[in-house]
From Swiss-Prot:
Assembly and interaction partners: Homodimer.
GMPS ATP-PPase domain sequence ranges: 208-400
InterPro entries in UniProt: Class_I_gatase-like (IPR029062), GATASE (IPR017926), GMP_synth_C (IPR001674), GMP_synth_GATase (IPR004739), GMP_synthase (IPR022955), GMPS_ATP_PPase_dom (IPR025777), NAD/GMP_synthase (IPR022310), Rossmann-like_a/b/a_fold (IPR014729)
Molecular-function GO terms, alphabetical: ATP binding; GMP synthase activity
Species of the source: Blochmanniella pennsylvanica (strain BPEN)
Pfam annotation, one family: GATase
Catalytic activity: XMP + L-glutamine + ATP + H2O = GMP + L-glutamate + AMP + diphosphate + 2 H(+)
Active-site residue numbers: 84, 181, 183
Name recorded for this polypeptide: GMP synthase [glutamine-hydrolyzing]
NCBIfam families for this protein: guaA_Cterm, guaA_Nterm, PRK00074.1
Glutamine amidotransferase type-1 domain mapped to chain residues: 7-207
Keyword hit for tRNA-binding: no
């Protein structure tokens, strides 16, 4: 069966929560994608959504250059749900009134009182208000504009504490709007509201499930590739490993993996993957040692974006050289996932900037007769891991912390040198070993060390020590789109720090990063 026959389209107005919204929809078993606000009619028809959700955004409908909803969207005859800015722009374009407020802005947790019945909200509430006797919701808001007059044929079904419009509905046309964010966990009944819209109003069925996803990827790959030969860029990370196992199931031995040792890897981690593949996966893997080639290309390069581009370019060169030595290869497979696409600014709102480039987004261009194959391009990391478990990958490998494509190059600030990589590998090993020993590794989403290109004074015995500084980074996250720094105990951090400065003689100082995403990214570069 096609696991994405029922689907929701999210029109993205630049909200920081858009990707979280997509995950919430998929958690309900319904496929979702986001698109730019200026999507064409033909693209929407091709996607064939059962319903549309309009995201929030940082803009004001009062400003002339703000993004808007294409008029044809309202003529599709399918349910539409506007969130925050999405509700405001829908109201504005349909004849309602939106005004900017100063004293009555709302940012954070607040309450909404339900005024009237609606299929959209019936029986969904957190408590009964003691004063009014009405049902109420605990919600999360973040807005400076408000809808002061709803469009014709709309009903106000909920208000905030200032009696401003918080929910509106046009039941006949299945158009709905809320001023708050149902996709964030602070809105306690947010999941119920999304589920009501998606399953009851849009009538979507829950078919986006792991077993169905695997079957669809396998069948689509077989149809697309046929009898052609495929080469896969294999890093040993969960994304490329799952891609390899899916290709193995789909096309057998029609593909070969190429693993490039660029000197920027955490080798002790890859040894485990290599052994697992040899014993369980029956994969054909070519191992290439190209360490010096990468280090030579990175000499004198300090800018992180340039480092990413150079690593991607050299990877491309090595792959192209190897592919030319292989017979009849027609496809290049990559373990690109949805978050790679998002952060690279591909297929997103034109109001979003590229956060960072990804070496595995966009493919290789030097060989004109080879096509790009990205089986897991539309999957989030947690979906990839679930598929991995279903394919027989052990839990500790499937949930191994992510390792960036450019490797240690973006965990070394400034110029990359082999000696820095060697230091960082030893430090990182200590940090991860202690996390596992204290049973913290599986509770943390990602942890690693960062090499800071500065010296700091220390004391070792009676000797003055002037050595390098290391930063430790550990975060907790669900989807890697947002993250909070992990609260590690002082005793644990003290133990790790002592081991590092005593066992790695090149290091004199250790610091701990307490920055969340946003505003910081998880990786330092």
């Amino acid at each position: 069966m096609k696991c994405n026959n029922h689907r929701i389209l999210v029109i993205d107005f630049g909200s920081q929560y858009t990707q979280l919204l997509l995950r919430r929809i998929r958690e309900l078993g319904v496929y979702s994608e986001s698109c730019s606000w200026n999507i064409s009619k033909s693209q929407v028809y091709a996607f064939n959504p059962n319903g549309i959700i309009l995201s929030g955004g940082p803009y004001s409908v009062i400003d002339n250059d703000s993004p808007y909803i294409p008029e044809f969207v309202f003529q599709l005859g399918i349910p539409i749900f506007g969130i925050c800015y999405g509700m405001q722009i829908m109201s504005f374009q349909l004849g309602g009134r939106v005004e900017r407020v100063i004293a009555q802005r709302e940012f954070g947790c607040t309450q909404v009182t339900i005024l009237s019945k609606s299929v959209f909200i019936n029986d969904i509430y957190d408590y009964v208000d003691d004063v009014t006797g009405r049902f109420a919701l605990d919600v999360w808001m973040s807005h400076g504009d408000v809808v002061t007059t709803v469009p014709k044929d709309f009903t106000v079904i909920g208000v905030n504490k200032y009696r401003q419009v918080a929910m509106m509905a046009n039941e006949d046309r299945h158009l709905y709007g809320v001023q708050f964010h149902p996709e964030v966990t602070h809105t306690k009944k947010g999941k119920s509201i999304l589920e009501r819209f998606i399953t009851c109003i849009c009538r979507c069925k829950s078919s986006w499930k792991i077993a169905n996803i695997i079957d669809d990827i396998v069948m689509d790959t077989r149809v697309k590739v046929g009898n052609d030969k495929v080469v896969l860029g294999f890093s040993g990370g969960i994304d490329s490993l799952v891609t390899a196992l899916l290709l193995r199931r789909a096309i057998g031995h029609q593909f070969i993996c190429i693993y490039i040792d660029n000197g920027l890897l955490s080798n002790y981690e890859f040894d485990r993957i290599k052994n697992f593949c040899a014993l369980n996966c029956n994969l054909d893997i070519i191992y290439l040692s190209q360490e010096q080639r990468f280090f030579n290309a990175l000499i004198g390069v300090n800018d992180p974006e340039k480092k990413r581009k150079i690593i991607g370019r050299v990877f491309t060169e090595v792959f192209e050289e190897q592919i030319r030595n292989l017979v009849a290869v027609k496809w290049l497979a990559q373990g690109t996932i949805y978050s790679d696409v998002i952060e690279s600014g591909v297929s997103l709102s034109s109001f979003k900037n590229v956060i960072k480039s990804h070496h595995n987004v966009g493919g290789f261009c030097g060989i004109t007769d080879i096509q790009l194959l990205e089986p897991i391009r539309n999957l989030f990391k947690d979906e990839v891991r679930s598929i991995g478990l279903d394919l027989g990958i052990p839990y500790d490998i499937a949930y191994r912390h992510p390792f960036p494509g450019p490797g240690l190059a973006i965990r070394i600030l400034g110029e990359v040198k082999k000696e820095y990589c060697d230091i960082l590998r030893r430090v990182d090993f200590i940090f991860i070993e202690e996390l596992k020993r204290e049973h913290l590794y599986s509770k943390i989403s990602q942890a690693f060390a960062v090499f800071l290109p500065t010296h700091s004074v220390g004391i070792q015995g009676d000797q003055r020590k002037y050595k390098w500084v290391i930063a430790l980074r550990a975060v907790e996250t669900i989807d890697f789109m947002t993250a909070h720094w992990a609260y590690l105990s002082y005793d644990f951090l003290n133990k790790v720090s002592n081991r590092i400065v005593n066992e790695v003689e090149e290091v004199s100082r250790v610091v701990y990063d307490i920055s969340s995403k946003p505003p910081a990214t998880i990786e330092w570069e």
